[in-house]
Every structure is written in structure tokens, then in C-alpha cells.
Amino acid sequence: MSREMALVAYRNLLRSARVAFQGDMNTLFAARAEVRRNFESNRSLTAGSDELSKQLTHAEEVAKFLRENVVQGQAADDEGSYKLRIHEHTERGNNEDIRKGKGKSTLGRVKCCSS
């Protein structure tokens, strides 16, 4: 069972790296090599061990992070603007936390070292 779970996590990481680094072959090859190296270093973990489940959970979290939070950018011009490659898996927030605090600036209201 754990061998199958490790294989699923491995493939999921490779897919996520392919989505995150599409078109950037150097970074994609480096990510694939890193994934392979990490899985090879944990090959000796025994099935059902706590360490194996921690490593599989970590692999799932990394795959999710790569897929949803990594965005590629290319310089669009000499003025410092970039064109971002946002794909269908990219997480898009609604900025509710920012809107809640709208108009409530705390800067300048706190006096440091005054009595």
C-alpha cells in the first residue's frame, strides 16, 4: 500500500512541477532532479512508519503549493514590467482580509518610547 502511495505522490509532484515550470526547461529539470533525489533518499523508509506518512504528506503539500502558488513571470519591457503566466490551477484570493481592514491604518498612531 505505501509503495503505491509513494508512487502517486511522486507522480503528482512531477505533474505539479510541469504545470508550475512550463516552458522553463532548466527549472523544470532541476525540480524533477530534486524530487527524484528526495524520493531516493527516503526509499529505505518502512511501510506504515510515521516518518513515511510525514514524508508523503510533505510531498502532497509541496505539490499543492507548486500547482497553486508558483507563477512564472517574464520581463515584458525595459521599464520593469512583467507578464505573468497564470494558469487554471493558480489560486486566486478574494482579498477579504484586506477589505476588512480598509481605512484602519495603525501606522502613526502608536507612540514608541513616550509616556
Curated annotation (Swiss-Prot):
GO annotation (BP), single: mitochondrial respiratory chain complex III assembly
GO terms under cellular component: mitochondrial matrix
One GO MF term: protein folding chaperone
Organism: Phaeosphaeria nodorum (strain SN15 / ATCC MYA-4574 / FGSC 10173) (Glume blotch fungus)
ATP-binding in keyword set: no
Known function: Assembly factor required for Rieske Fe-S protein RIP1 incorporation into the cytochrome b-c1 (CIII) complex. Functions as a chaperone, binding to this subunit within the mitochondrial matrix and stabilizing it prior to its translocation and insertion into the late CIII dimeric intermediate within the mitochondrial inner membrane. Modulates the mitochondrial matrix zinc pool.
Region (Disordered): 90-115
Swiss-Prot/TrEMBL keywords: Chaperone, Mitochondrion, Transit peptide
Assembly mode: Interacts with RIP1.
Protein name per Swiss-Prot or TrEMBL: Mitochondrial zinc maintenance protein 1, mitochondrial
Family: Belongs to the complex I LYR family. MZM1 subfamily.
Compositionally biased intervals (Basic and acidic residues): 90-100
Cell location: Mitochondrion matrix
Predominant place of localization: mitochondrion
Transit peptide: 1-20
Domain of life of the organism encoding this protein: Eukaryota
